[in-house]
Amino acid sequence: PYPYPYGFALNTLGGDGDCVDCFVVTDKALQSGEIVDYVPVHLLEQVEDGEVDHKVLGVLTGSPNVVDDLALETIRGFIMSVFSDVPGKQMQLGTLHGASEALRYLQKCRV
């Protein structure tokens, strides 16, 4: 299971040709397909098989705009564990950026 709700930012197109992936760091149980308002807090660089597949990490609107170190390590560990079981898959995690870079990336990917 995913450690936090995982989905995508509406009306975006990332480097892999899909919508921009997002983790919403919350203790609240979200339903599959539920559309929520969130605040981007970080951008985690990820390259998968040579394609940019960065992840936006955010919190629900109205929550404190903080993703703590434990949540960050949990997400990094989850991503690494998912790809460690896929033969031939090349995946690399890069720099963790702050909110301003996450917002710039989302704006750049808007369609």
Where are these regions (language model features)?
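Hydrophobic N-terminal alpha-helices or hydrophobic patches in metabolic proteins across all domains
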Residues: 1-111
